[in-house]
Amino acid sequence: MSLDVRVIAPNKVIWAKNAEEVILPSQSGMLGILTSHAPLYTALNTGVMKIRNETGWTSIVVMGGFVEVEKNEVLVLVNAGEYVDEIDLSAAKKDVEKALETFNSAEAPKEKEEAAEFLKYAQARLKAVVDK
């Protein structure tokens, strides 16, 4: 038996395949999902999720969101996401620099909050590429 896993961002379906295991960056730490997991609804942090299927592990950087687990179906809704293997190291470094500049120049609380989220995502992307 396997999990039916879907990872969906507003602009694309990132993953829609079966898997044996999913590891997610939840608000309370890393969360592992295996078949027959109890029903679950929880918020996700920005970070790297991992999916294991018959070909091995796949890593996806996600920018927050939510996960719903029920009856071996895992629905992950994220604000943004991309495969770690598709991230260019030099571009990721530049994105961190740009996000840091945006954060430092933001003045209004809402701007600062949004800039902080993008900085966190940029840093997660860079860390994921460096760690792979």
Swiss-Prot record:
Q: Which NCBIfam families match?
A: ATP_synt_epsi
Q: Identify its membrane topology class.
A: Peripheral membrane protein
Q: What GO cellular component entries does it have?
A: cyanelle thylakoid membrane; proton-transporting ATP synthase complex
Q: Where in the cell is it found?
A: Plastid, Cyanelle thylakoid membrane
What are the record keywords, sorted? ATP synthesis, CF(1), Cyanelle, Hydrogen ion transport, Ion transport, Membrane, Plastid, Thylakoid, Transport
Q: What is this protein called?
A: ATP synthase epsilon chain, cyanelle
Q: Does the keyword Cytoplasm apply?
A: no
Task: Provide the family line.
Answer: Belongs to the ATPase epsilon chain family.
Q: What does this protein do?
A: Produces ATP from ADP in the presence of a proton gradient across the membrane.
UniProt superkingdom: Eukaryota
**InterPro entries the record matches:** ATP_synth_F1_dsu/esu, ATP_synth_F1_dsu/esu_N, ATPsynth_dsu/esu_N
